Amino acid sequence: MNGSTHPEGSRAFDREYEGTLESLRSTRNDVSAWLRTNECDHEMVERAVLVTSELASNAVQAAPGCPYGVKIRAAGESLVELAVSNQFVSTSPPDRDRWFPTTPTAPRGRGLSIVEALSRDVRVDVDDSVVCVTALLQTAPDQ
């Protein structure tokens, strides 16, 4: 890819994982390896792995035991779209204005705010039976 910072023109990443906490390590490793294979720079790989980890953790917590999917694709010049989807079980993700912990010391509730801070944009789509959170990541510094 001639030193580019993202996987433009490469095949997309599309995998499904078991809905268990034990699967999170494999998910992070697979995403990291795929991005490095596609010559993404270190900073981009680190951000994408953290975003993946937060979204996959949310998917497992929202639907324990149900598989979740991870997709990554180039989304234009210097952008990568990373999506994690899971079965809709009982509750949908909170509205954007509630993407923070209820108190500063709360043990949970930071995932979507972390994803939002690391992403150019975040979209939550809820279908009849599937929740899909898509993060748009900038792969190169703004010019």
Where are these predicted regions, by residue range?
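Histidine-centered phosphotransfer motif of kinases
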Residues: 47-65
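Conserved beta-strand-loop-beta-strand hairpin that lines the nucleotide-binding pocket
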Residues: 1-14, 60-143
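STAS-typified acidic loop motif
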Residues: 14-26
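Residues in soluble alpha-helical coiled-coils and helical-bundle/repeat scaffolds
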Residues: 22, 39-43, 123
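Conserved short strand/loop->alpha-helix "switch" segment adjacent to the catalytic nucleotide/phosphoryl-transfer site
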Residues: 29-53, 104
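Short, structured helix-loop boundary elements
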Residues: 21-24, 45, 112
